From Swiss-Prot:
Co-factor binding comment: Binds 1 copper ion per subunit.
Entry keywords, A to Z: Carbohydrate metabolism, Cellulose degradation, Copper, Disulfide bond, Glycoprotein, Metal-binding, Monooxygenase, Oxidoreductase, Polysaccharide degradation, Secreted, Signal
Organism placement in taxonomy: Eukaryota, Fungi, Dikarya, Basidiomycota, Agaricomycotina
Protein EC: 1.14.99.56
Role description: Lytic polysaccharide monooxygenase (LPMO) that depolymerizes crystalline and amorphous polysaccharides via the oxidation of scissile alpha- or beta-(1-4)-glycosidic bonds, yielding C4 oxidation products. Catalysis by LPMOs requires the reduction of the active-site copper from Cu(II) to Cu(I) by a reducing agent and H(2)O(2) or O(2) as a cosubstrate. Active on cellulose and cello-oligosaccharides, as well as plant cell wall-derived hemicellulosic polysaccharides. Also active on cello-oligosaccharides such as cellohexaose, cellopentaose or cellotetraose.
Protein name: AA9 family lytic polysaccharide monooxygenase A
Annotated residues for binding of Cu(2+): H19, H96, Y179
Disulfide-bond pairs as recorded: C59-C182
Length: 264
């Protein structure tokens, strides 16, 4: 069998048990505890969003206000930690190559309308962003922008490309797979940079958007890949994909969380 066909078959098999979502966040290297349904607007499953017109493109399925908010300051480091089934397993299948992005929006919007501002993305350098995320135990960091104090949604996005050679509209069993989690974050104190106009999700990603269709298996040069969405906001403060701390919470598949402690 041709290598490309084998690779596609392998990705199909792996995708059945390779999904992911965010467990919680770290602030300046301090674990804020299990955030699922506590300060993370956790979806009921770790399945991806594949329909670009689905309202779940904003904050995944079951977007709603959850009980708590994590307190940060402008210029703090905010780290997302992804997981598969438990906190100590591989966070996603190694076949799920692709980029990572982080957006921010005022919480009052509930993620609706042209409110999402991209503050970080990472595609391919010497390896795909997701490959490096696996090595980093699912942890990637953004620096909290110098935006005014208030409540915000920080939206982490993985775009897995292992089935992105075909549009979802052409084959509902395929298409780019978006793993999305939104964290409720309170910035206090804040800064004086005004967020620019954002994009709407759903809406901004369409079948013709660069980065939605990509064939991992036909020899395409990954350094030419362009991530979906706008460029990173020019006043964003950057981020990285790297391990910031070793999880210490008990290994559990329950959705119960503990109160976040905020920045230390």
């Amino acid at each position: 069998m041709h290598f490309a066909a084998l690779a596609i078959l392998s990705s199909l098999v792996a995708s059945a048990a390779a999904h992911t979502r965010v467990w919680g966040v770290w602030v300046n290297g301090v674990d804020q505890g299990d955030g699922r349904d506590i300060y993370i607007r956790s979806p009921p499953t770790n399945d991806p969003v594949v329909n670009l017109t689905d309202p779940a493109m904003a904050c995944n399925v079951d977007n709603r206000v959850v009980p708590q908010w994590v307190s940060v300051k402008s210029n703090d480091s905010l780290t997302f930690e992804w997981y598969h089934n438990t906190r100590d397993d591989d966070i996603i299948a190694s076949s799920h190559h692709g980029p990572i992005a982080v957006y921010v929006a005022p919480a009052a919007s509930n993620g609706s309308g042209p409110v999402w501002v991209k503050i970080f993305d990472d595609t391919y350098t010497t390896s795909w962003a997701v490959d490096r995320l696996i090595t980093a135990h699912g942890q990637h960091t953004v620096i909290v922008p110098d935006i005014p104090a208030g409540d915000y949604l920080f939206r982490a996005e993985i775009n897995a490309l292992h089935q992105a050679d075909v549009l979802y509209d052409q084959d509902p069993l395929r298409g780019a797979q978006f793993y999305i989690s939104c964290a409720q974050i309170t910035i206090t104190p804040g800064g004086d940079e005004t967020l620019p106009a954002g994009i709407a999700l759903p809406g901004a990603y369409t079948d013709s958007t660069p980065g939605i269709v990509w064939n991992l298996y036909n020899g395409s040069d990954p350094t030419e890949y362009v991530a979906p969405g706008p460029p990173v906001w020019t006043d964003a403060l950057g981020g990285s994909i790297a391990l910031v701390g070793i999880p210490v919470l008990p290994n559990t598949t329950s959705s119960a969380g503990v109160a976040p402690t905020g920045a230390a």
